[in-house]
Amino acid sequence: MRRVFLAAMLLFTSGLATATECVVLLHGLSRSSLSMNKMERALIEAGYATANIDYPSRDHVIEELAVIAVTAGIAECRAQSATKRIHFVTHSLGGILVRQYLSDYELPELGRVVMLGPPNQGSAAVDALGDVPGFDWINGPAGRQLGKGADSVPLGLGPADFELGVIAGTRTIDPVTSAVLPDPDDGKVSVEDTRLEGMADFVIVPHSHAFMMRMQRVIDLTKAFLATGSFGDADGRD
């Protein structure tokens, strides 16, 4: 039923983008594709084909998840025969999976990438709270790799050599985690730790890590970057 609904939206939409452009959406740790549904609908309305991927974020290390999730998204986009360009919109861990994949594989159709709240420099919360009972059950092996220590995967990856826009949040609904993070933060990642050398644009929004992907301002900024490679004249620059 979901595929029928999305196909109908694609048939009747008349946005600026065309169906030759496909967007892979990757959710964050311990989330599902449902968290990206509002973003997906907006992108379809803008004329993009989409591949909103579910992947088992708590079951594998990042290196394995990157292959599982990104490969699935690329395959779904390529299955839509008109696709000539593949973009990515990611939340949190999803952005690290794209970085990991692109460090190992080439993607000739690669377009632009928008990362929402990515722990590009790791998150101090992992190091501070990693010994709390239940951490591994909630976050799985990939969660352990998102810190700032010797096992950090993000810190072992290189700068962006692709068109990247990063959106960072400054509102928290998680005071416990925020207490161990440098200010400002979104409840999971500090603003400073979302940055990545080589990124094309960067913007700060007053939203939380958990819900930023559902906020209209974030959706509008995402569409702007996918279309132009810039967040435009948006507030929140520093």
Feature map (PLM): residue ranges:
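Serine-dependent carboxylesterase/thioesterase catalytic core
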Residues: 21-34, 38, 44-58, 62-161
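Boundary at the C-terminal end of the N-terminal hydrophobic targeting segment
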Residues: 17-19
